Each structure stands twice: as C-alpha cells, then as structure tokens.
Design a protein with these regions (language model features):
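Short helix-capping/linker turns of helical repeat alpha-solenoids
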Residues: 61-64, 78-79, 99-101, 114-116, ...
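Hydrophobic face of amphipathic alpha-helices that form TPR/SEL1-like repeat modules
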Residues: 70-77, 107-114, 146-155, 212-217, ...
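TPR/TPR-like (Sel1-like) alpha-helical repeat modules
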Residues: 232-236, 376-393
C-alpha cells in the first residue's frame, strides 16, 4: 500500500531532476518615523521606502500618489510591519490610478490579471495595461504579455503553484498543445515576445524573468537554454530591494537552480543549484524552501536527511505552499524522519487538496479508499479522485473507475 501512495508523489530525479508542482509571519512593527518629520506641507520626500506605514498614510491621504502606491505594495506583499491585505492594497492602487499615476494603473492591471482581491478579468487587465503603457510604464508591457499568454493557456504565471511544466525528462522538451496552429495564435505570441523584449531592454526585472521563461520552454520562440540562463542571471544580479521585484528575483534563482539540477544549458552542478535555492529561500520564497526539502529528502547534492527535509517543507508550509503541505503528509504516511502518523498525513493532504492540488487529492482518495487515518469511505474517496480527474491528473480517471466498481459491488 505504501508503495502505491509513494508513486503518487511526483518526484522525478533523472540526473537529479526535481519536480514540485506560498508570506512570513508578521513581526513586531519597526520603529516608526515620527509623522511630524514627513507631514510638513510641501516637503519633498526622496525615499518613500524609508517611511513607516503611518508616515506613508499621512502623505497618501494628502493625495501623494507615490505614497499611495508604496502603501499598496506593502499591503500586497506584506512586510515586517504590515500584514498582507489585498483589498486595502487594491484601494490604494485605485486611488493612485484615479489621480493619474500610471504605476497605480499598472498595479491594478496585475490584480485583474491574476484575480487577486477581485474576480479575474483579462479584458479589464488588458485595458489597464494599455493605459499604463501609453503612460510610459515599462512593467505594463510585461502585464500585457502575460494577458496574451494567459488567454492562450501557456501557463506563464509567476504565482502558479503547479510546476508541471518542469516534469519532463532531462533534455526533453515538454509536449504542449499546438500553440502555433493558427495565424492568430502565432501573431499573439509574436506580440507577447515583442512586449517582453522591450521591457527586458528597459531593465524591467519581470520582463527579463519572463523572457528567460519563454526561451527555456520554447513558448513563441525557439527553445534556447543559453538565452534563458542569461536572462535569469541578469535578474539574480539585481540589487533591487523593491517589494515588487522580489518575486522575479526569487523565481529566477529557482529557475537557475533547476537548470543546474537538470543540466539544461549548463553542466549539472548540484552545489550551485542548492546555493540558488538557498538564496531564494532566505529571501522568503516558499517554492525554494520546498525544493531544498526535495534535495534533502532524495539525497541529491546533500546527504539524505528526512528531518532536514521536513524542516524546509514546514518553512514552505507556513506560507501555505501546497506541494510542501502534500509532501509533509507523505513523510508522515511513510514515517520518514517522523513516526508513522496517518492522521497527520490526512491533515496535511487536506490542506493541500483544498488549494486544488491534484496530487494531494489523489493521495486523499487513496487514504479514504483504504481507511488510513480516516474511516474507510468510498464515496469520499471517489469525490477526491474525481476532483483530480477533472483537473486532468494522470491516473485519477482509472481510480474513479476502480472505486465506482467497488461502490456498485456493495449495492
């Protein structure tokens, strides 16, 4: 039985290939800058990032659009003194946009692109990005390119938690839908590549990251690991401390780490891969912490250490990263680094499954089908298998057929 569930944990390691398919605890507020120092009428602020939340609020309510955007950033990403709050972030971005600040308009576009704090609306996002582009915001070109790629279902989403695009064997280009089967699709991809190239030339980190992504995966361009490596490297060399740049910096470090693991365009170098993962993990990336956990669990580039793996999975799980939650359940099920605990396995698999993580849904189906950690319940097992099957997870359909047959036998 354990062998069966273990096979469900998608983890391919030819030459160390990793598969994985999300904010930190709020600390005590930092010392605030007295508002009287920055709220003087007509005072020109040179560094908004040095201001406290309350200091920014004073300026923001006076109509300072840069302060409004900075508040939006703090609320969108969360920091030492600010809890993440998408609704309030959206409000500040809207206020900045309404005052004519195109950076606020661009920020709004990303919320509608990703469905963060609002229902996803690609048409609205496209409108906002075009307005921001007309206003000279280079990052809006990245947003518009992502609208195109999202409409085409190219899975180019910085926030995606499902890393299935990394599931091919070493050196093998993943199969995809016929993404250039029509002239319209080809023109759309061409436009997306042009937009990303323009943004990258303007030193926009998002543009450089996504350009690296499309070259690595051959989306709208010929697959070119060398160019992908170059663009990712440019991003990782950035010293930007801006909140909105950290995702691209982290994602680029992760991408480089995986290229070193798989030997894509470089010699396999597990030590360098670990360094990139550690850099991103220390910068708050849950996905990077998960990959480090995978290295320790499998013993790739490091001595196998299940307790260390659990440590990193828990670090990622603190940010609700579904693959890490799933893997914690896997360790509890098998008793790797911990005592066998089916109840804990079920608990963590549920946390991952609630996020739509198909692997965890299949694992939960197996646990309910066999009564591990829960009372055996074929109907519940069937429900989880069907969820995974609806998302196209390989093997889930066969499980649905099997459990339906068991249910029919009981009738």
């Amino acid at each position: 039985m354990k062998e069966y569930i273990r096979l469900l944990m998608i983890f391919i390691l030819p030459m160390g290939v990793l598969l994985g398919c999300g904010k930190a605890d709020v600390e005590e507020p930092a010392e605030q800058v007295p508002t009287e120092q920055i709220a003087i009428e007509g005072t020109e602020v040179e560094d908004y990032s040095a201001l406290s939340y309350s200091g920014l609020e004073v300026l923001a309510y006076e109509g300072d659009s840069q302060a409004q955007i900075m508040l939006g950033r703090k609320l969108e990403y969360g920091d030492e003194e600010t809890a993440q709050n998408f609704t309030e972030a959206l409000s500040w971005y809207q206020m900045a946009s309404d005052s004519g600040d195109y950076n606020g308009t661009c920020a709004l576009g990303y919320f509608y692109l990703t469905g963060t704090g609002v229902d996803q609306n690609l048409d609205k996002a496209e409108e906002l990005f075009n307005t921001a582009i007309d206003g000279g915001v280079d990052n809006a070109k990245v947003g518009l390119a992502r609208v195109i790629l999202t409409r085409g279902d190219y899975l180019v989403n910085l926030d995606a938690q499902d890393d299935e695009e990394l599931s091919t064997e070493d050196g093998e280009k993943e199969e995809s839908k016929d993404k250039t089967s029509t002239e319209e699709q080809s023109e759309d991809l061409k436009k997306a590549v042009e937009l990303l190239t323009e943004a990258a030339k303007a030193e926009d980190l998002d543009g450089q990251y996504y350009l690296g992504f499309i070259y690595e995966h051959g989306v709208g361009v010929a697959l070119d690991y060398s160019k992908a490596f170059d663009y990712y490297s440019r991003v990782t060399r950035s010293e930007s401390m801006a909140l909105q740049d950290q995702d691209s910096i982290n994602q680029s470090n992760i991408a480089l780490g995986l290229m070193y693991i798989k030997g894509h365009g470089v010699e396999v170098d597990e030590d360098t891969a670990l360094e990139h993962f550690e850099t991103a993990s220390e910068n708050g990336s849950a996905k990077a912490s998960y990959y480090i956990g995978q290295l320790y669990e499998s013993g790739v580039g490091v001595d196998r250490d299940y307790e260390k793996a659990m440590e990193y999975y828990l670090l990622a799980a603190d940010k609700d990263y579904a693959p890490a939650l799933n893997q914690i359940g896997y360790l509890y099920y098998n008793g790797y680094g911990v005592d066998v605990d089916f109840a804990s396995a079920v608990y963590y698999q549920k946390l991952a499954a609630l996020q739509g993580y198909a692997i965890a849904q299949v694992n939960l189906g197996f646990l309910y089908e066999n009564g591990y950690g829960v009372e055996r319940n074929l109907e519940t097992a069937l429900s989880y298998y069907e969820m995974a099957a609806d998302s196209g997870y390989e093997g889930a359909t066969e499980a649905v057929v099997r459990v339906k047959a068991q249910i029919n036998e009981k009738l």
